[in-house]
Amino acid sequence: RSIMSIKKQFLWINIIGGLSVLGGYVYALIDHPVLRAQIWGGVPETWQPWITMFMFISGFGYCYGMYYLIFNEGLNLKFFGGKYEASIMRTLLILFLVSASMWIHSTFNYLELPNAKSWNMIRIELWCTALSILFMTVGLATAKGIKNIKVHKLSVVGLGIISFHCLVFDAILWTSNFPTDF
């Protein structure tokens, strides 16, 4: 496959996956007006505005990282110390977007009918989301063949920000504070 083909794949994966994630959030929040306030779980109210602000910063970081990969030299690189082609990043991207699109629906299912199986599914989804974007960040940070060092570093920072958010705020903080009733 040519580089142009992988670029188109990345673009379409982001369009479809991004719409699935964001559209899924909108649908889930509109569909559950009574439970909507409970989606924060036990995260302290004073932290919520800061985490919300960081969500937008994380989204920008993700978009910058994807810009570099799709429209700059990113997909021409050899990832994870020069050992892998862009196809590994495509796999991680799909895993990231699929798992990111699932957790909110699983959470509302759990809020409606709390049980250990649903709770474990949420945790698996959040950890898959966090680890897949973290591995993308590591893959990009350790890539070989970089020509535009400044843009590369900024894209690593961008993916690092969303990795931090998904790992620390979602997979660790949110799951640690969410009340479980089983």
Ranges and model annotations:
Residues 4-18, 86-88, 146-161:
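Alpha-helical transmembrane segments and their helix-start/interface "positive-inside/aromatic belt" motifs
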Residues 5-8, 39-49, 80-87, 117-120, ...:
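Juxtamembrane loop-transmembrane helix junctions in multi-pass integral membrane proteins
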Residues 44-62:
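Interfacial helix-start motif at the membrane-water boundary
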